[in-house]
Design a protein with these regions (language model features):
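Surface-exposed peri-terminal alpha-helical interaction modules
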Residues: 1-82
Length: 82
């Protein structure tokens, strides 16, 4: 079994190769990174909303509230990042 490293766990080699600017514009890399980050945040929001929905259906309101609070915090981060 191989040792798990931070880089391997996060698949950093793949993640960091996903930014492929198409022009020589200085701001393009920033644009790509910000928008890719927002897509990842949106993916997490969807996950949290599904989790909250399941928890509410099960009557687990405190964990559902925590999931919805995470959604709110993620939205705040997204708003402040651009």
């Amino acid at each position: 079994m191989t040792d798990m490293t931070y880089a391997r766990y996060l698949a950093l080699d793949i993640l960091l190769s996903c930014q492929k600017p198409q022009s020589a514009e200085d701001d393009e890399m920033l644009f790509i990174v910000i928008h890719q980050t927002k897509e990842l945040w949106l993916k997490q929001i969807i996950r949290e909303l599904y989790l909250a929905k399941r928890q509410i259906a099960a009557g687990a309101l405190v964990p559902a509230y925590k999931a919805l609070a995470r959604v709110s915090r993620i939205q705040a981060v997204m708003t402040l990042s651009w």
